[in-house]
Regions:
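Contiguous mixed-secondary-structure segments that line small-molecule binding/active-site clefts
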Residues: 51, 56-60, 64-162
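Short, well-ordered beta-strand elements
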Residues: 1-16, 20-24, 31-37, 140-145
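Acidic helix-start/capping segments at beta-turn-to-alpha-helix junctions
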Residues: 37-45, 49
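Generic non-transmembrane alpha-helix signal with a bias for helix starts/N-cap capping motifs
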Residues: 20-21, 46, 100, 148
Length: 162
């Protein structure tokens, strides 16, 4: 039976981990699978999953699209804050143009195969201290963002500390 190594960066409660476990359950009759569900517990950064996959240390991984910006700059489209009106608009972009383009770029330039995109949910800005009503409400609030330089710049411009 062929070996298959899968790695991720989330714990048991994560929808990502649960999805990978669902996938493993569906293909476990065909592969001898090992799953390192959270490499960050071992001091590795989530972003290292890309190179681990490129180097065949693992064969399957998942990551937020922002991590791929240095490999496919066009993927920043998915990180444009406040750009898309709704999820259907994003899904249309992915299904009609972006997925095919990203697939080709990954395989031809990076020896990676895209299995698909999944919805990682909408991003909301909230705080347990105050109501955010306008950009002034954001001044000097700490915010955790994706690794996207675009997100960091936009939120800093709004007054957040990222």
């Amino acid at each position: 039976m062929k070996k298959l190594k899968i790695a991720g960066y989330q714990g048991d409660g994560s929808v990502h981990t649960r999805s990978v476990k669902f996938f493993i359950n569906k293909v476990s009759n065909y592969f001898n699978i090992s799953f390192d569900q959270d490499i960050t517990e071992k001091g590795k950064k989530a972003a290292s999953l890309i190179e681990m996959t490129m180097n065949n240390e693992i064969q399957i991984s998942y990551l937020w699209s922002s991590y791929y910006e240095k490999y496919i700059p066009e993927i920043k489209l998915l990180d444009l804050p406040f750009y898309f009106k709704n999820k259907n608009e994003v899904k249309s972009l992915i299904n009609n143009d972006l997925q095919a383009y990203v697939s080709i770029e990954l395989i031809e330039k990076n020896n990676l195969k895209l299995l698909g995109f999944w919805d990682n949910g909408s991003r909301h800005i909230s705080t347990n201290n105050n109501i955010i009503k306008n950009p002034k409400s954001c001044e000097n609030l700490k915010i955790r963002t994706t690794p996207s330089p675009l997100h960091i710049d936009v939120f800093n411009e709004l007054g957040f500390i990222s």
